[in-house]
């Protein structure tokens, strides 16, 4: 990373003395997670790293950097040992998006036996219609304040990097105040949520959700084993089946609505139209039609989709050392989930895997 011509001023420095904390602490991590948006958290693939840990309680907050590319780091082993001791002495550990931080802490050998509290899950119980469960939005609601990001953004501009996705490249002096504030806000917000959870008679449900969070993180890290050799064999078999079906239709593009409409009309079939007069060759059209040629087109499309989405993408491309590591979501959140309280999954969505057809069973 090239040093800027004009270096922004920063007064923050890593702590020299590591303080004692109370038995209720908030923790927030800063990470290098290059494939987060595309594939979910990197802790399940080990393709990123933690660069610093922030801790806060009612009296104080600190940031402990140990992996910033730009420097200002503490000894990593010292930080991990200290954080482990803080957690062991705590009666509860607070997070904003606990599943993310718990997974990364696990890669450092940091385990939490105390109750885990996630303020975003708490807010989903309090207000299932909330526009956003981000830390910044919750700070606006409960604290009438927001995260202070200007210093971080100025430094990122000076070093010509992305303020959020690449902050790990900055010297820690430009990240420290921002990271500390994330932990500080998390702790403060939860103190406001506690009476609301009790007033709405949600405490028992809330405690159940808290117990579930570490279990789901463990499920993600454990993953589901897949047989890659059989997946390769199934991929070849389905490719051949699809090819055999497609040869019957010449140059017909089986994904083109205009071509499918014309082909179907040449067979004497009536094709539904939209209000604007465009052909509507939907799934319902294929299911309702009993013409053998149309059925073969539908079969070719189904095989293509199942093969590409589930065999090639999910099993062959998204596996890590022979396992699929999906993310599990307890509630609605800014990154997905449901408002009904039903568990959902993503990266990949395991609930979409077909199981009724012969191909689905093979998958």
Question: Which residues does each PLM region occupy?
Answer:
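Phosphate- and divalent-cation-binding pockets in alpha/beta enzyme and binding domains
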Residues: 100-107, 262-263
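Short, glycine/acidic-enriched loop or turn micro-motifs at the edges of active sites
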Residues: 31-33, 99-100, 121
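Conserved "right-hand" nucleotidyltransferase catalytic core of DNA-directed polymerases
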Residues: 1-68, 113, 130, 141-143, ...
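Glycine-rich phosphate-binding/catalytic subdomain of phosphoryl-transfer
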Residues: 104-107, 132, 136-140, 144-148
């Amino acid at each position: 990373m090239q040093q800027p011509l004009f270096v922004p001023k920063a007064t923050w420095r890593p702590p020299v003395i590591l303080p004692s904390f109370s038995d209720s602490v908030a923790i927030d991590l800063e990470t290098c997670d290059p494939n987060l948006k595309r594939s979910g958290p990197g802790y399940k693939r080990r393709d990123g790293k933690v660069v610093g840990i922030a801790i806060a309680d009612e009296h104080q907050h600190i940031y402990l950097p140990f992996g910033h590319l730009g420097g200002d780091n503490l000894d990593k082993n010292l930080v991990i040992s200290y954080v482990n001791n803080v957690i062991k002495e705590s009666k509860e550990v607070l997070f904003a998006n606990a599943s993310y931080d718990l997974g990364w802490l696990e890669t450092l050998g940091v385990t939490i036996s105390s109750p885990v509290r996630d303020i975003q899950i708490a807010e989903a119980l309090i207000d299932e219609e909330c526009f956003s469960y981000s830390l910044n939005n919750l700070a606006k609601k409960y604290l009438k304040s927001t995260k202070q990001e200007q210093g971080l953004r100025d430094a990122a501009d000076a070093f010509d990097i992305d303020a959020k996705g690449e902050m790990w490249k900055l010297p820690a002096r430009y990240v420290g105040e921002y990271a500390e504030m994330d932990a500080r806000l998390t702790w403060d917000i939860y103190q406001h949520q506690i009476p609301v959870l009790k007033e709405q008679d949600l405490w028992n449900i809330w405690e159940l959700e808290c117990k579930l969070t570490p279990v789901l993180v463990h499920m993600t890290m454990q993953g589901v084993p897949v047989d890659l050799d059989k997946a390769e064999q199934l991929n070849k078999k389905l490719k051949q089946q699809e090819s055999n079906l497609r040869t019957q239709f010449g140059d017909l593009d089986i994904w083109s609505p205009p071509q499918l409409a014309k082909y179907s009309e040449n067979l004497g079939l009536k094709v539904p139209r939209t209000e604007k007069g465009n052909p509507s060759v939907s799934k319902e059209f294929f299911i309702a039609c009993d013409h053998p040629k149309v059925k073969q087109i539908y079969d070719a499309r189904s095989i293509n989709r199942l093969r590409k989405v589930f065999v090639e993408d999910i099993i062959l491309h998204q596996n890590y050392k022979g396992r699929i590591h999906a993310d599990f979501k307890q509630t609605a959140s800014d990154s997905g989930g449901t408002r009904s309280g039903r568990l959902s999954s993503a990266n990949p969505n395991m609930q979409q895997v077909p199981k009724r057809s012969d191909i689905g069973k093979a998958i």
